Each structure stands twice: as structure tokens, then as C-alpha cells.
Amino acid sequence: MNAPVKPSNLIKGATGDWEMVIGLEVHAQVTSNAKLFSGASTAFGGEPNSHVSLVDAAMPGMLPVINEECVRQAVRTGLGLNAQINLRSVFDRKNYFYPDLPQGYQISQYKSPIVGEGEIVVDLADGASIAVGIERLHLEQDAGKSLHDQHADMSAIDLNRSGVALMEIVSKPDLRSSEQAKAYVTKLRTILRYLGTCDGDMEKGSLRADVNVSVRRPGAALGTRCEIKNVNSIRFIGQAIEHEARRQIGILEDGGSIDQETRLFDPDKGETRAMRSKEEAHDYRYFPDPDLLPLEFSQGFVEALKADLPELPDQKKTRFIGDFGLTPYDAAVLVGEHESANFYEAVLAGLANGRRDGKLAANWVINELFGRLNKESRGIAASPVSASQLAAIVDLIGEETISGKIAKDLFEIVWTEGGDPRTLVEARGMKQVTDMGAIEKAVDDIVAANPDKAAQVRAKPQMIGWFVGQVMKASGGKANPQAVNDLLKTKLGL
């Protein structure tokens, strides 16, 4: 039975509503110093053909030897995706011709992948979450790269990437909108980065996606899908899906039919174009690679890797909510990038009372620090304010040495000039005024100077904020806001 379709996920066509059905095949480059079947370097950015072994170049007589680290990374990824780990898997030859595939086949896994079914939970922008099924994860070789801009009348081949280990992570067709697809890839990339199994750098090609899109009437049978190859940014994934769905709907509403085909996305034009008819599995003539024995390992091997897994985003989010009272939204923002979560934890480690001030620290990390970093297009690694400096600012607020307003001024000074926050507060006279006599005098002066406003506040107590603001202004932001508020209530008889 089909689940009801959310109205927000429907596309309005000329003849009625349509639903997208989306599945993704994400190719993640394994973090490893050597390639899947050779000892050649995987370093990015080398001179063309400078990281190529005889195995990678498919020289006669060269035999592949499995890199155990790549196997470990694939198993760790499978565990991070809550997936079934298969203790026996088989490498197959996927036969096709392409100039940057020197063997004439790709070593992949077909019927017996290293990782089976799993699931990840994806948080959406509207606060809802969806479970996306993982169909499988298998190991395979990457191909080389064709370069078409080196010569006017010929193409060049760079085999540096040839033989680099890829994990192909295949989702089930559980996604129903471009926003869901983008959120899924974002969450998957975050998990991979936490695990350290792929750096997720889409600009360098470390993570790229084949996007399968079909459309149907709500509740109808699945339509014919088209595959959009090698989409290399999350923004482009969303654009490619939107265009492809509209293209298919236009054809169907004009009485046509969808051809199952492979397409390419042109980011400059924001459209997809036909590349070739979509191959079926039998077109590749898969058969087990005779040069490689089946890959077998014990449950103990899996358990040892499982015991060594880091805390993953969902676990960290739950801990942040439970230990520090963060909202689910704030916790999700902090764990969304590994570096962000690490920075927040470093701030917590520097606090005098992390459990008490964890929520305050989160507010400062998200609103002040991230806000400023985004404004200046900086990554967290380039932050002028360190975790220890931000922790000191939060401590000064928590112990009521400075007010929130003064804290923002202090943050600006540390951002632009650097320095120890406590030393700066002392040197620049930024301490909060806690002398009740001085605060009371300021309150009396403001109330006496504004009798009409005082009468209005007595009639409408919620207007007391105006008086609080005036007293804070008169004190240069140094008065204790709570003390000001309490004194005003007493003086005004509220």
C-alpha cells in the first residue's frame, strides 16, 4: 500500500498533480593512502599520470591485490549506515569500453556486495524527518579521467584516478523531492566525514552522485526512470532533479512516453541532455573476477571495527539535547559539520561550568560565531576567535561579570584585535555594574524624567522593556539587566 503523498511534494502539471520518485547512487572516494588493488598513491592534484602503477595501467601479467584498509573503511561505513555487513562478498568484472578504462572492464561488486541493506534518518528543513533505505554499498575501482582541453584535435588520458577505491552507496527510491534528495546527500556526507571514510569534497570529485528520477501520478505504479550521471554538487543535484522531473511531466502530458536513458546535467544551462540509452545489467556481462578470491572476514573483524567507531551525528545530537538542553534545531546545526561539533565541544571543555552554560555557549557559537563566519565567507578553521576565547566570553556572561550587550562588544574586539577576554574586560573597564545603589539611582532618574511613560507601564506592564532599555543605555550597557528589571518593577509598583 502506498503511503499518502505530502501536498508540498507534489508538482502541479497542466493536467493534474505529479509525484517524483528519486533514488541516488553516491560514489564516495575511500580515504586511503593507496588504491584499491595497487600501492599507487591516491593524492589529489599530482601531475597527470604521476600516480599510476603497472596494475592501474593494465599492463599484461599484472594482478590485483586487495588493499585491506579499503575493506576496513567500507565496513566502517556500512556500520555507520546501520547496514548489514556481509562476511563474504565477491568482486566482479563489469565489462565496457571507455578510453580512460585501460583494463576494458571495471572491478566492482554485483550480486554479492560487501554491505547490504541499511537506513539513515534525514532531518528536513521543516522540522520533519524521513527514513531513507540503503539498498547496498559495494567497493569498486574508479576510472581515469579524459582531458579534452589539452589539445585542439585530440583528448588526453590521466590515469591518476584509475584504480582509486570507491564506495557506491545505493539508496532505495524513498525520496520524493529535490529538497529531500539534497538533505539526504548532506546527511550522508556528514556521516562519511565523521567516520573518516571519505572527505566528501565534491569540488575534487571525492563525492559525486548518479541521480535516478521518475514521475508518476500520486499512488500510481512507478514510472520509467532516467539516470543523471556524475552530478558533483548538492545544489546541482537539486537543480537536475527539478529540471528532469519537469521534462518528463511535459512529455507525458503531451501524450508521449519516457525513454529509459542516461543523461548529463548542464549546470550552465540548468538542464539535462541525453547521453545514451540506459544499460541493463546484462549489457555489462558481469562475471566473478578470476584474479581475485572471494572477500571473506569474520564477525570478530566487524565487531572490532564497530567498537572503534566514533560518536556519529545522531548520537551526538541526542547527547547535546540531553546534556545541555539544546533545541533539536540548535543541536542539528552544531552536528551538521564535524568541525562545528568539534569546535562546540572545545568551547564546552573550556567552560567553568559546561553543564550550566552549554546552552548559552551553543547560542554564541551558532548566532555570533557562525553568523560572522558566514558573513565573511570563512570556514570555522579560519575563525579569528578560538574556542578557548569564546569559552572565556561565555564564562564572563555566566558569572555576570559582563552583560550580553557588553559581551557582543567584547566579541568584536577579540575578532578584530585578538587578546584574552578577561584581560580586555579589566583593561577597558567593561565589567558589569553590580552596585545596587548606582543602578537604583539610574532607575530613579529615568522614572522621574518620564512620568507619562511610567503611567503607561503601570497600565500595561509589558511595556517595562522601554524603561529597561533606557537604564541600560544610561549605564553604557554595563548595568545588570535582571537587577534593572527587578528594581523597575518595585519602583513602578508592578
UniProtKB/Swiss-Prot annotation:
It comes from Nitrobacter hamburgensis (strain DSM 10229 / NCIMB 13809 / X14). The gene is gatB. This is Aspartyl/glutamyl-tRNA(Asn/Gln) amidotransferase subunit B. Belongs to the GatB/GatE family. GatB subfamily. GO terms for biological process: glutaminyl-tRNAGln biosynthesis via transamidation; translation. SUPFAM superfamilies: GatB/YqeY motif (SSF89095), Glutamine synthetase/guanido kinase (SSF55931). The lineage of its organism: Bacteria, Pseudomonadati, Pseudomonadota, Alphaproteobacteria, Hyphomicrobiales. Heterotrimer of A, B and C subunits. NCBIfam families: gatB (TIGR00133), PRK05477.1-2 (NF004012), PRK05477.1-4 (NF004014), PRK05477.1-5 (NF004015). Its EC number is 6.3.5.-. It holds the Pfam family GatB_N. One of its GO terms (molecular function) is glutaminyl-tRNA synthase (glutamine-hydrolyzing) activity. Disulfide bonds: none annotated. Allows the formation of correctly charged Asn-tRNA(Asn) or Gln-tRNA(Gln) through the transamidation of misacylated Asp-tRNA(Asn) or Glu-tRNA(Gln) in organisms which lack either or both of asparaginyl-tRNA or glutaminyl-tRNA synthetases. The reaction takes place in the presence of glutamine and ATP through an activated phospho-Asp-tRNA(Asn) or phospho-Glu-tRNA(Gln).
